[in-house]
C-alpha cells in the first residue's frame, strides 16, 4: 500500500468521527508491531497537511521481557522527529513469576493500559491513538457474538472520564492486508513480541 492511500483512509476516519481537534496532543501507542508503526507513519504524514494543528508523541510500555530491543523504534521516531517515551514496568515479573498466571492476557491488558494512561497524562497528552484496523474491529465483533452472545466492537472515538483522555482509532478503515503491504514496502522496523503466550490465546 502506498503512503497516499494510507493517508486517505486515515483522514476519512479522522474527519468522519472528528478524532482530531485544533491543539490536540496525541500519544501514539507503539507496541513494536506492524499496526502501530503503520499508524505512526499515517499520523506523521497527516500532521504535515491537516488543517487542524496537533502534536504527536509516541510511547511504549516496556513490560519487562528480556532482550526486548526498542532501539529500532527509537531510531525511527528520531528520524520522524517525534518525541518517544519508553515507560518501564514490572508487568512481566508480576504476571509470570509472582502470580504465575496461566492465561494472563486480560490482566496484562488492564495493567498495561493503566501504566500507559498514567504516562500519557504525565506527557501532557489529551488523546491516545490505538492502531486497531478494520480486521480487528470485525474479529472483535465476531468473538463478542460467539463468546458473549452480543454484538460489540471498538468505538472510533471514546472519552475516558476517569483519566480525562480520549481514545481514537484512525486506522479503522484500513485492511490488514494493506498494513502488511505498507510494512513490507517501507521496511518498517517491527520488533517481535517476547511474550511467551503470544499467539496461543484468543483475543
Across the structure, where does each feature detected by a protein language model lie?
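Short, cationic motifs built from Arg/Lys/His that form the positively charged side of catalytic pockets
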Residues: 112-113, 169, 176, 203
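Residues at structural and domain junctions
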Residues: 102, 168-169, 196
